[in-house]
């Protein structure tokens, strides 16, 4: 008995010493977590989800690794050391630490799936160019992006990421393996039209990319920053771009006669076309509200800058006055408005024809017309159809029947599409295009790209596109930043905008940062294309896949595991000969 007790005591001391040595040496735990999971700062329990990442050729494989430190680790950096399958290798992998943004006020009414954060901070921006540090017990997600293309060899790839950091005075390194299966399925050009409106035309917006220093419109730096936008937008499947024809035209005016220089419009279109982000040109709005929300729309009219025109309603054009021309708002019935429209639109149409862009061009009239100001919208639409024949009119709408005949590409907000679905089905039979949009709404249980919603709902927006045969998606807020957006309260304007509504990318110094929401949106756009590929082989099967995820306009599969299962079924089916 004494001997047993001695051995028991010895064994206990041995285990204790081993545990002590282990806990002393083990300074970091690395966990793989599904990239559709938002990892809150206060989370402290993880299971290593070493599931294989599965993608088609042409998709971007995303891997999320959570670093959990048992001690303080400073200046953490990450590098993918290799990704290979036999002799085949994947190149171009990038890493970025996931940053956290503050949400000061939650939106209402909330979704049943809303994420609640005790700290008030949510993961969103991806920061690839900074070293991060963590305190003892703190967690930090790492985002890894691995691009593939049509030439990528299918197979199971094994990758390793190296994470380095300083512990005390020593630099240490930790390693984590992950697996990616590339399927023999190849994406082509996206069949879904996507536009997230960019505010880069505003000097204030561009100043946030220049250490808050002004950026002169149309300067070399201006065009450089536009090019940076175009590349990021193209890489995330944005293939429709809004360009304001009135704002980017240079005018002269003499005795009622205008001349038009469209070269600045052309340059912006060329920049986006060069990177593959201009399947369609989205002509910016020609008219604006004359006052309150339901007031009639007035047309934007450039007029000579003088005391008389200075008293007219001011256009939202950031320039206000240029080259002796003031940008004003006038009723479409005003003779000065008619004079401008009847000269500008035919000249612009001729220019689009000369550039070979007419078939790609669409024209906004005014944003979100309501039943009360629909009549002014219809009047302006008649002018557009008369002087821009063949050009489709598109707009985001908050009403339906009152605008019949005035719009060619209907973009109802998601809940309006839901409530008036039969109306939009009838429009489709007439040859109209149907898209949808989300913005500050709808809320409740509808999918959106709010920061407080699960990432799968951002991705599901484009499954909704597929299920309800809406061939495009629009959102107003690519980059409507406030000062110091990375550190600002994400629920902008005293909580009136849900967090994440105003932007889905973030500003750096002459660079842009993506977000985990923007990555999820891109992946949803790719899902749409995969569903279309299934449809071409087996329409009923494609419907079953969509129905397994999207139950209704505002009811979805919440389980990430179930979603991954359906994705695997899609890729397995498309891999069959």
Model-derived segments and their meaning:
Residues 1-25:
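Bacterial Sec-dependent N-terminal signal peptides
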Residues 453-503:
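Substrate-binding cleft of secreted/luminal carbohydrate-active enzymes
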Residues 64-68, 145-147:
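Short edge beta-strand/loop segments characteristic of extracellular beta-sandwich folds
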Residues 25-47, 70-144, 152:
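Surface-exposed binding patches on compact interaction domains or structured appendages
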Residues 312-377, 382-398, 486-577:
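Catalytic domains of carbohydrate-active enzymes that cleave complex glycans
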Residues 47, 58-64, 140-141, 153-160:
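Short, solvent-exposed loop/turn segments enriched in Ser/Thr/Gly
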Residues 429-458:
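Active-site clefts of carbohydrate-active enzymes
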Residues 114-115, 122-127, 131, 138, ...:
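Aromatic-lined carbohydrate-binding surfaces of glycoside hydrolases
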């Amino acid at each position: 008995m004494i001997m047993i007790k001695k051995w028991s005591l010895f064994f206990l001391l041995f285990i204790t010493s081993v545990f002590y040595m282990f806990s002393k040496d083990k300074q970091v735990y690395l966990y793989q977590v599904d990239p559709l999971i938002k990892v809150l700062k206060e989370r402290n329990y993880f299971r290593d989800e070493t599931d294989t990442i599965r993608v088609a050729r042409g998709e971007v494989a995303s891997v999320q690794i959570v670093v959990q430190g048992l001690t303080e680790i400073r200046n953490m950096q990450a590098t993918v050391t290799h990704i290979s399958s036999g002799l085949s290798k994947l190149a171009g992998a990038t890493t970025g630490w996931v940053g956290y943004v503050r949400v000061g006020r939650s939106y209402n009414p909330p979704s049943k799936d809303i994420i609640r954060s005790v700290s008030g901070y949510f993961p969103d921006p991806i920061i690839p160019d900074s070293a991060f540090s963590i305190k003892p017990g703190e967690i930090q997600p790492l985002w890894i992006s691995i691009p593939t293309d049509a030439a990528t060899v299918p197979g199971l790839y094994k990758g390793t990421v190296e994470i380095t950091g300083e512990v005390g005075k020593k630099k240490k390194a930790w390693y984590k393996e992950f697996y990616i299966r590339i399927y023999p399925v190849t994406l082509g050009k996206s069949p879904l039209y996507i536009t997230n409106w960019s505010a880069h035309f505003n000097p204030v917006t561009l100043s946030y990319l220049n250490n808050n220093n002004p950026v002169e419109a149309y300067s070399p730096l201006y065009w450089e920053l536009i090019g940076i936008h175009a590349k990021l937008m193209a890489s995330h499947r944005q293939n429709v771009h809004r360009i304001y024809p009135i704002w980017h035209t240079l005018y002269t005016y003499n005795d009622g006669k205008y001349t038009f220089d469209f070269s600045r419009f052309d340059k912006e279109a060329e920049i986006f076309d060069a990177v593959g982000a201009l399947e369609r040109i989205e002509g910016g709005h020609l008219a604006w509200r004359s006052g309150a929300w339901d007031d009639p729309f007035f047309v934007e009219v450039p007029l000579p800058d003088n005391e008389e025109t200075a008293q007219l309603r001011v256009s939202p054009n950031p320039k206000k006055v240029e080259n002796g021309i003031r940008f004003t708002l006038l009723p479409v019935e005003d003779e000065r408005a008619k004079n401008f429209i009847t000269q500008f639109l035919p000249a612009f149409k001729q220019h689009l024809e000369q550039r070979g862009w007419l078939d790609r061009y669409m024209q906004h009239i005014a944003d979100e017309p309501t039943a009360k100001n629909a009549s002014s919208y219809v009047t302006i639409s008649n002018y557009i159809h008369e002087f821009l024949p063949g050009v489709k009119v598109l707009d985001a709408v908050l009403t339906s029947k009152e605008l019949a005949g005035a719009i060619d590409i209907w973009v109802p907000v998601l809940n309006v599409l839901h409530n008036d679905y039969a109306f939009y089905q009838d429009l489709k039979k007439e040859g109209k295009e149907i898209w949808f949009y989300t913005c500050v709404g709808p809320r409740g249980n509808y999918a959106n790209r709010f920061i407080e919603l699960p990432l799968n709902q951002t991705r599901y927006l484009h499954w909704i596109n597929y299920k309800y045969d809406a061939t495009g998606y629009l959102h107003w807020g690519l980059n409507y930043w406030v000062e110091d957006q990375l550190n600002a309260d994400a629920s902008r304007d005293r909580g009136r905008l849900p967090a994440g509504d105003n932007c889905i990318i973030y500003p750096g110094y002459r660079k842009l940062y993506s977000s985990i929401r923007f990555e999820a949106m891109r992946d949803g756009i790719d899902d749409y294309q995969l569903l279309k590929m299934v449809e071409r082989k087996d329409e009923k099967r494609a419907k079953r896949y969509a129905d397994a995820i999207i139950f209704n306009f505002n009811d979805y599969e919440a389980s990430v595991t179930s979603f991954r299962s359906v994705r695997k079924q899609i890729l397995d089916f498309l891999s069959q000969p």
